């Protein structure tokens, strides 16, 4: 008879759920069917690099929540990164980005398209629902998304990103965090 101790498979199972989250995020609805998302899973040393970049950003900008979140992600066996490029939908009538239409918005390429941000939000929601369904603790962090973009972890021209660190321990490290 084989005996498997949960502690021996914990990190492996968290990574397995991260993979399910990535697939769920990919299949989330997208405006006009246009997929501008990039979805990554990082582990090990890459999480350490991400944490170090978050600390640097926190120090450079005087933002203590970057420092708090940098510590918060270190025990995670996996972090899911989700980002989007900025591409308009070619609409003649919209204005939700603040410009009259997509042609006007195109003159300001760094200004986000609401549909890209919305698609990213749907993907994040789909991903965290998978984590919740598997009782994996998680937290959506813009701080880690910012650091991932600074580190150029994404291969594409990602301009908006979030990170979802994961944990399966006796107590969620993402819940009772100090407010800063």
Residue ranges of each PLM-predicted region?
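Acidic, surface-exposed loops and disordered segments
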Residues: 1-180
């Amino acid at each position: 008879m084989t005996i498997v101790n949960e502690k021996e498979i914990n990190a492996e199972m968290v990574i397995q759920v991260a993979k399910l989250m990535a697939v769920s995020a990919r299949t989330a609805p997208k405006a006009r069917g246009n997929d501008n998302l990039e979805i990554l899973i990082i582990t090990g040393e890459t999480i350490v690099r991400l944490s170090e970049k978050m600390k640097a950003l926190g120090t450079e900008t005087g933002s203590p929540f970057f420092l708090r979140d940098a510590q918060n992600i270190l025990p995670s066996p996996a972090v899911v990164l989700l980002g989007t490029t900025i591409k308009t939908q070619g609409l003649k009538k919209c204005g939700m980005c603040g410009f009259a239409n997509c042609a006007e918005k195109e003159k300001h390429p760094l200004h986000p398209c609401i549909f890209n941000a919305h698609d990213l939000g749907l993907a994040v929601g789909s991903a965290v629902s998978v984590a919740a369904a598997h009782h994996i603790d998680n937290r959506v962090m813009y701080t880690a998304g910012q650091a991932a973009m600074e580190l150029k972890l994404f291969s594409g021209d990602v301009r908006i990103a979030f990170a979802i660190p994961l944990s399966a321990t006796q107590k969620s490290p993402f819940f009772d965090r100090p407010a800063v």
